[in-house]
A protein has these predicted regions:
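Conserved ABC ATPase signature
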Residues: 58-62, 66, 303-307, 311
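H-loop/switch region of ABC-family ATPase nucleotide-binding domains
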Residues: 118-119, 363-364
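Helix-to-loop junction immediately C-terminal to a conserved catalytic motif
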Residues: 229
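ABC-family nucleotide-binding domains
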Residues: 93, 338
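The feature captures the beta-strand-to-loop junction immediately N-terminal to the Walker
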Residues: 214-216
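Conserved ABC ATPase "signature" region
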Residues: 36-54, 284-299
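Catalytic Walker B motif of ABC-type/P-loop ATPase nucleotide-binding domains
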Residues: 83-86, 328-331
């Protein structure tokens, strides 16, 4: 433990403090370092990792990506010889993933050993020395990055692996039928603790639309999602459904939200029971079919808390299919998912779209957006500067929003 530093997939499970500076300092304190050294190490860590804006913050008010940065910083401050990172990019926006890549490059130059369990591969291809492929508890292959790039797309997908180059990911052909508008937001302003998060937002959404919501960590995407579902009440402006105003209570009745941290919404003693929890007269045939489609049938009797992060995510997505609500909001539904699980979730969302559901997806996953979304909303600096269709014509703008360069990824 003195030589190995671990960053968990869910950073919340490794926090011991309520503010960021104390969390970064926690490990050093337990080494009984002198107070002055402790202060210097915290300051040096914040400078090295460029997280000065996250200092002296309440951990409970951070976004998922910001929590991930603090978890990494708390390990970096202890200066371990070996880093173990479990899905370190799962909660990060594309800019933060670029920063993570630079942090990994930094500790590699320092002579540290880094082991990363990861499904997103593209940001590691210039850094990794070896790529170890595991299947069912066994090592099935060890590759150099160059050997890994030579794998065909079919072979990579058979192995359940994500794209190694986001420049090779393209949107499908657009739908020719315009959706029927049902949801409208007029001059909506959202606040959190008296601070304006989003200002004067206006948009409409139609039946069957799948709308991506993007922006940097802390841009207000989750607050926007909660407001759509009637869970965030500190707002001005109008929400309309089929041209009629709907207040928080009715939005809550019409909607279902899959949270970024699904541990907050798993209540039952088994996966099967979770899929019908709180639903009157659940359709057992639909429950069985959904479990089968998402590869959850083998786990139907297991307690949800015994599942992996990706499996828990699929359970929450399964509930969204079964609950019968009109408005569905997914907050990072592909966090921690491999290629197979991601395509399963994408297929399920397309089915929900075909059923006429209005779907919003908060995501940083360019590959997933190209498979599922019809348009993308971009939040930045409290505003919504972009509403971009997911089409080949708009591909340059989409790549810009997701920081995918025309040359080598930055």
């Amino acid at each position: 433990a003195a030589k190995v530093g671990s960053v968990f997939q869910n950073p919340r499970t490794q926090f011991f403090n309520v503010d960021t500076d104390s969390e970064i300092a926690f490990g050093i304190e337990n080494e009984a370092r002198p107070p002055q050294e402790l202060i210097e190490r915290v300051e040096q860590t914040a400078d090295d990792l460029r997280i000065q804006k996250l200092r002296n913050r309440n951990i409970f008010e951070l976004s998922g990506g910001e929590k991930q940065k603090i978890a990494f910083a708390s390990v970096y401050a202890m200066n371990p010889q070996i880093y173990l990172l479990d899905e370190p990019s799962s909660n990060l926006d594309m800019t933060s993933i670029q920063e993570l890549r630079e942090h990994l490059r930094l500790i590699k130059k320092q002579g540290k050993t880094v082991l990363i369990a990861e499904h997103r591969l593209y940001y590691l291809m210039e850094l990794a020395d070896r790529i170890v492929y595991l299947e069912k508890g066994e090592i099935k292959g060890i590759y150099t990055p160059e050997e890994f790039r030579q794998l065909s797309e079919q072979e990579r997908e058979r192995m359940g692996l994500r794209a190694v180059d986001l420049r090779a990911v393209f949107p499908p052909k657009p739908h020719s039928i315009a959706p029927i508008p049902v949801l409208e937001l007029r001059n909506v302003t959202l606040r959190y603790k008296k601070r304006t998060i989003l200002h004067d937002i206006g948009l409409s959404a139609g039946k069957g639309e799948v709308i991506g919501v993007v922006g940097h960590n802390g841009a207000g995407k989750t607050t926007f999602s909660r407001a759509l579902c009637g869970l965030h009440k500190d707002c001005d402006g109008q929400f309309l459904w089929e041209s009629k105003p709907i207040e928080c209570k009715e939005r809550l009745q019409r909607s279902y939200m899959v949270m970024q941290d699904v541990n907050y919404e798993l209540f039952a003693d088994s996966v099967e029971a979770e899929c019908s929890f709180g639903i009157r007269n659940p359709d057992q045939t639909l429950v069985n079919a959904t479990l089968e489609e998402l590869g959850l049938s083998p786990y139907r009797e297991q307690h949800p808390n015994t599942l992996s992060g990706g499996q828990k995510q699929r359970v929450a997505v399964a509930v969204s299919m079964i609950c019968g609500k009109d408005l569905l909001v997914f907050d990072e539904p592909t966090s921690g998912l491999d290629f197979d699980s991601m395509t399963q979730v994408a297929g399920l969302i397309r089915r929900l779209s075909n059923m006429g559901k209005v779907i919003f997806i908060v995501t940083h996953d360019f590959e997933f957006v190209c498979r599922t979304c019809s348009r993308v909303l971009h939040f930045d600096e409290g505003e919504m500067p972009d509403d971009v269709p997911v089409t080949m014509d708009a591909l340059p703008k989409l790549r810009e929003l997701f920081s995918v360069s025309d040359g080598k990824e930055r």
